[in-house]
Every structure is written in structure tokens, then in C-alpha cells.
């Protein structure tokens, strides 16, 4: 009942945030704020943003030790490195297929819906500054950055991919050492349970954070920003909705009828990701939801962190729409071959860049330059990026939950055959040491 109440509270907070943000903007700015009124709105938004920032920092505080603990325990109970390699290859195969699905669907929809054609609003000058730091987009630097020089630094920076690399080495070494490393496995199990309990405490703040995040987005920007780019936003959300349907059909194909109940189990983390515009904020709850659904923790603890770097289906859809929308807005014709090559470039360059701030915009900016498109076009979508980030973050959670479920099925089934009742999340009572 507590989990259902929390979901209800988050929905109420979402609606209240929309109303309060909208009313505050209109009451202070009257639709066309003076410099003083704009400063007042910015100050209100700043205080609201503080609440969201605190919540997201508390979530990030949990992620590093939780990823480390669950992954080490999961690898230790796999029993051999062959199983680890098999799960890794199956995960990457699914990630690539899901990315291609997102790109293809996005490409088709952009041509059908034409979100940028005949855009009736002034375009930014082609040389306008975007404040996007492309120096962070260096393929050699990105590949080098995957490997940690210090696990302390990786955890301090909350770099999931580096934590995964260290945890894999640590877990494999524990398996090789055998019984002498058993105390370390028990310590990792205890760490996981403690972090899940902390997650339960932090999530009680979720409704307040959701209210602040949504109100903050509307207080400063106002409702008119949605109207100006409403059709583009509608097109993106149509694409995300169709992607949900297609991923759901694939889940039905590989997981069976139980895939329908998966959406009930992940509804809370999906709602958190949507409201906070952060798939990272939903990571701990997604891990718990998959555990209750029956995905062995040795699978979910490996697939989910990898998915946060390599399986961002919602972000792939958004980048497809944004890139081709900008080309259409400037009246630049790209032949089909160029478009396909550009989208494949997006797919390759987006892998492993999740730790970069505003990662999607960095990838889009670099890709636009490579294909001689005006980088300034990003300014068109920047104003509504937060509202689109809500949808793509929720989609990323759905995509990774389905990925973990499918890989679990490929690895011999989802246990138990009858999922646990949807109840208040807590540290799994069956223990992570039971071979799951």
C-alpha cells in the first residue's frame, strides 16, 4: 500500500507543480515580464531548483555503492567468467538492436510528421553561441575515460561505467579466490541491503522533489515556450509512445505474458524518472522493481548499470528527432543515405557518454558540425529540453527494465514463476546470496 500511496503522491505533486508553476509565472510576469519581474521569477525558480538538486544529490549518493555492491554479489554468484561474458554479449546484442529500433522509428516518423518544416518562428543565426562544450566529445578521451585510474575517484564522480569496470574485476577476482573471499561477498550483500534501506528513506522526499522540478520548469520559462514548439514536442512524444509499444511487443515476444505485469512493477521508477527528468533518479527503485518481478539480481545488477551507458532508447529517439528537426527548420535537404549515416554516427558516439553533463546535446552538437548543419539550431530545442527530457528519461527506464527481463529469460528464465506482490520496496528479504 505504501508504494501505491507514493505513486499517488507523486502524481498529485506533478499536477500541483504544473498549476503552481504556471500561476506563479502569470501572476508575477503577466505573460511578458519586465527585467525586475524576470529577476523575481528567476529567484523563485532558483529556490525551487534547490529542492530538486538536494533530492538528486541524495539519489546520486546511493548509486555508486549500490552499483558496486549488487554487481560484485551478482558476479560472485554467477560462478564463472564464462557466464559473465555470455550475459555481457547478450546484453550488448539487445542494446544494439534496441538502438537501431529507436533510430529507425525516429527516422520514419520525422519524415511523416515533418516537425521542422515551415517553422513559423525566427531561426537563430547560424553562428549563434550555444554554450555546448564539445571539447568533452573526443572519442579517444571517451574510450580512455571508461577505465578508472582510481575507484575512489570514480565513486566520487559517480561515474557508473568506471564503477562497473572495477566491480567486474573485483567480482571476477572474488570468484577466482573462492571461499577465502566469502567475507567480502557477505560484506557486499550487507552493503546492498543498507543502500536499499537508504533508498527507501530518500524516496519519501520524491513527491516534494517532483513538485519543485515541474514548478521550477514553468515558473521561469512560462507556458508560452511550450506553445511555440508544441508541435515538435508532440512529435517527439508520439515517437516515444510508439517506441514503448514496440519495446512492449518485443518483451511479449521474448518474456511472454508476464511482460504485461512488468509495467506495473516499474510504474513508480518510471514516474520518478519522468517527473524528475532523470533516469538516474530511478535507478535504485528500478533495481528493486526488477527483483520483485523475478529478474535474478545477478542479471539485473549487471545489465542495468551497463544500460545506463549503452541502452538509452529514449535519448536515441530524441537525438534523431532533434537532429533532423534542425535540418528541416533551416531548410537543409539531406539525402536518405546521409540521414542514415548521421543516425548511425549518433548511435556510435552516444555510447559511453552518459556521464557527460547534457550528454544528448553534446552528441547532437558534435554530429551537426560533422554534417555541416548549424549547431545554433540546438537553441531551438534548448528551451523545451527539460520537458522532452522527462519523456526520454522515462523511456530509458522502460528500455533498461525490458532489457534486463529479456536477458534474464535468455539466461534460463525469470524466477519465481509467479512474481512477488507489489508492495512497499525494501531490501530483498530472500538475500542476494541465494544465487540470484
Q: Which residue stretches match the model-derived regions?
A:
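Signature of multi-pass transmembrane helix bundles
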Residues: 2-3, 7-11, 18-23, 44, ...
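Membrane-water interface of transmembrane alpha-helices in multipass transporters/channels
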Residues: 40-47, 85, 187, 223-231, ...
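Hydrophobic transmembrane alpha-helical segments of multi-pass transport and channel proteins
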Residues: 58, 96-100, 237, 241-242, ...
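Membrane-interfacial loop-to-helix junctions in multi-pass transporters
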Residues: 60-61, 139-140, 158-163, 199-204, ...
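Transmembrane helix boundary and interhelical junction motifs in multipass membrane proteins
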Residues: 66-67, 206-209, 278-286, 299, ...
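Juxtamembrane helix-boundary/capping and inter-helix hinge elements in multi-pass membrane proteins
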Residues: 76-83, 118-119, 177-182, 190, ...
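Helix-loop-helix junctions within the multi-pass membrane cores of secondary transporters/permeases
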Residues: 268-350, 404, 416-428
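Hydrophobic alpha-helical transmembrane segments of membrane transport and translocation systems
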Residues: 357-423
Amino acid at each position: 500500500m505504501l508504494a501505491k500511496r507514493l505513486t499517488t503522491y507523486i502524481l498529485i505533486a506533478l499536477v500541483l507543480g504544473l498549476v503552481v508553476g504556471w500561476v506563479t509565472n502569470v501572476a508575477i510576469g503577466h505573460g511578458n515580464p519586465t527585467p525586475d519581474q524576470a529577476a523575481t521569477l528567476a529567484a523563485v525558480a532558483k529556490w525551487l531548483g534547490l529542492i530538486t538538486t538536494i533530492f538528486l544529490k541524495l539519489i546520486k549518493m546511493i548509486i555508486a555503492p549500490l552499483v558496486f555492491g549488487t554487481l560484485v554479489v551478482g558476479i560472485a554468484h554467477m560462478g564463472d567468467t564464462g557466464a559473465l561474458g555470455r550475459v555481457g554479449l547478450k546484453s550488448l546484442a539487445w542494446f544494439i538492436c534496441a538502438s537501431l529500433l529507436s533510430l529507425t522509428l525516429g527516422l520514419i516518423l520525422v519524415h511523416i510528421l515533418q516537425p521542422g518544416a515551415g517553422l513559423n518562428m525566427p531561426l537563430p543565426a547560424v553562428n549563434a553561441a550555444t554554450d555546448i562544450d564539445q571539447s568533452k566529445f573526443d572519442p579517444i578521451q571517451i574510450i580512455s575515460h571508461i577505465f578508472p585510474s582510481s575507484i575512489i575517484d570514480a565513486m566520487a564522480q559517480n561515474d557508473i561505467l568506471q564503477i562497473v569496470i572495477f566491480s567486474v574485476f573485483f567480482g571476477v577476482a572474488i570468484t577466482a579466490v573462492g571461499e577465502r573471499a566469502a567475507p567480502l561477498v557477505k560484506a557486499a550483500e550487507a552493503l546492498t541491503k543498507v543502500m536499499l534501506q537508504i533508498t527507501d528513506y530518500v524516496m519519501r522526499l520524491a513527491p516534494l522533489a517532483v513538485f519543485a522540478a515541474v514548478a521550477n520548469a514553468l515558473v521561469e520559462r512560462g507556458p508560452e515556450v511550450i506553445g511555440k514548439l508544441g508541435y515538435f514536442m508532440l512529435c517527439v512524444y508520439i515517437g516515444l509512445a510508439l517506441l514503448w509499444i514496440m519495446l512492449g511487443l518485443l518483451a511479449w515476444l521474448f518474456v511472454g505474458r508476464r511482460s504485461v505485469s512488468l509495467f506495473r512493477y516499474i510504474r513508480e521508477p518510471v514516474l520518478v524518472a519522468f517527473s524528475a527528468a532523470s533516469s538516474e533518479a530511478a535507478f535504485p527503485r528500478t533495481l528493486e522493481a526488477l527483483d520483485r518481478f523475478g529478474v535474478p539480481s545477478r542479471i539485473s545488477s549487471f545489465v542495468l548499470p551497463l544500460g545506463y551507458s549503452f541502452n538509452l532508447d529514449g535519448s536515441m529517439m530524441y537525438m534523431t528527432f532533434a537532429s533532423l528537426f534542425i535540418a528541416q527548420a533551416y531548410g537543409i535537404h539531406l539525402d536518405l543515405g546521409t540521414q542514415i549515416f548521421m543516425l548511425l554516427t549518433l548511435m556510435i558516439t552516444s555510447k559511453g557518454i552518459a556521464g557527460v553533463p547534457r550528454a544528448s546535446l553534446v552528441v547532437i552538437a558534435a554530429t551537426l558540425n560533422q554534417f555541416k548543419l548549424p549547431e545554433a539550431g540546438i537553441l531551438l530545442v534548448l528551451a523545451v529540453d527539460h520537458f522532452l527530457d522527462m519523456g526520454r528519461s522515462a523511456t530509458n527506464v522502460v528500455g533498461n527494465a525490458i532489457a534486463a527481463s529479456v536477458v534474464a529469460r535468455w539466461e534460463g528464465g525469470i524466477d519465481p514463476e509467479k512474481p512477488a506482490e507489489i508492495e512497499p520496496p525494501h531490501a530483498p528479504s530472500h538475500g542476494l546470496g541465494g544465487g540470484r
